From Swiss-Prot:
This is Purine nucleoside phosphorylase. The lineage of its organism: Bacteria, Bacillati, Actinomycetota, Actinomycetes, Kitasatosporales. Purine nucleoside phosphorylase involved in purine salvage. GO terms for molecular function: S-methyl-5-thioadenosine phosphorylase activity. SUPFAM superfamilies: Purine and uridine phosphorylases. It comes from Streptomyces coelicolor (strain ATCC BAA-471 / A3(2) / M145). Although this enzyme belongs to the family of MTA phosphorylases based on sequence homology, it lacks several conserved amino acids in the substrate binding pocket that confer specificity towards MTA. The record marks 231 as: Important for substrate specificity. Homohexamer. Dimer of a homotrimer. It catalyses: a purine D-ribonucleoside + phosphate = a purine nucleobase + alpha-D-ribose 1-phosphate. Pfam families: PNP_UDP_1. InterPro entries: MTAP, Nucleoside_phosphorylase_d, Nucleoside_phosphorylase_sf.
Length: 280
């Protein structure tokens, strides 16, 4: 039974991925930061132990700005995950990134404003310990090994991905104005979403490998001339592509190295700095 509550890879995604796992065990995990979005669902994918966490909770009841990102990443690490895949829906900021495009970003820009985004905030933990001030590098926020696995998996499924680009993360839950969208595009950014930060930053602080896979579900307001983005259209395009994305995730999981064989810098992100708290 102990094996059933352990995983080496985490996947944070939407409700369309529940059927992703075989032989599923549901596990409730408590964290010093409160409960994660939902239970962890642990099972096997391509012979690998995987923990799936529904980012918005069952029934999609958590808006992006109210997701407990710190608890989510902490929970995944606590069951053994050291590599995390984070698929999410985004809007395309350029006409060439239309609905159905899979973009694997290599950068992000944070335009959120109210989300706790670090474990090292100097505030006491419930047990009284106080984290030290720690500054991790986020120059390259995504795991190079995970990105390579995701790109190879997509190509193997005959879905040519966009290799690289910048994901701008906004607060939500509203969609952007045309002025905001045009400004994002003018900066040279590629896609816009609501959940990519602080996942990547928190994963780095926990020395986890994190890879974002963004599925374009719509052209953002500044890239189209219609009535703007609608939630219904986002859901329709996501549903039309979820099977393909599941297949890419399946193959990416199979291609990731064993946790003890990681050769990327993610596992040494703290660089020997003392976090002042016991990581799970």
């Amino acid at each position: 039974m102990a094996n059933k509550v352990k995983a080496e890879i985490g996947v944070i995604g939407g409700s369309g991925f529940y059927s992703f796992l075989d032989d599923v065990t549901e596990v409730r995990v408590d964290t010093p930061y409160g409960p994660p979005s939902d239970s962890l669902f642990l099972g096997e994918v391509a012979g690998r132990r995987v923990a799936f966490l529904p980012r918005h909770g069952r029934g999609h009841h958590l808006p992006p700005h109210r997701i407990n990102y710190r608890a989510n990443l902490w929970a995944l690490r606590s069951v053994g995950a050291r590599q995390v895949l984070g698929p999410c829906a985004v809007g395309g900021l350029r006409p060439e990134y239309g609905p159905g495009t899979l973009l694997v970003p290599d950068q992000f820009v944070d335009r959120t404003r109210s989300r706790p985004s670090t474990y090292f905030d100097g505030l006491p933990m419930p047990d009284g310990t106080v984290p030290n001030v720690v500054h991790v590098s986020l120059a390259d926020p995504y795991c190079p090994t995970g990105r390579a696995a995701a790109l190879k998996a997509a190509r193997g499924r005959e879905w040519e991905p966009v290799d690289g680009g910048t994901l701008v993360v906004v607060e939500g839950p509203r969609f952007g104005t045309r002025a905001e969208s045009l400004w994002h595009r003018a900066q040279g950014w590629s896609v816009v979403g609501m959940t990519g930060h602080p996942e990547a930053a928190l994963a780095r602080e926990l020395e986890l490998c994190y890879t974002s896979l963004t599925l374009v579900t719509d052209l953002d307001a500044g890239a189209e001339s219609g009535e703007g983005v609608s939630h219904e259209e986002v859901l329709r395009v996501f549903a039309a592509n979820v099977d393909r994305l599941r297949g890419v995730l399946f193959d990416a999981v199979a291609a990731l190295p064993a946790s003890g064989e990681r050769d990327c810098p993610c596992g040494a992100a703290l660089g020997g700095m003392d976090p002042g708290i016991a990581l799970p």
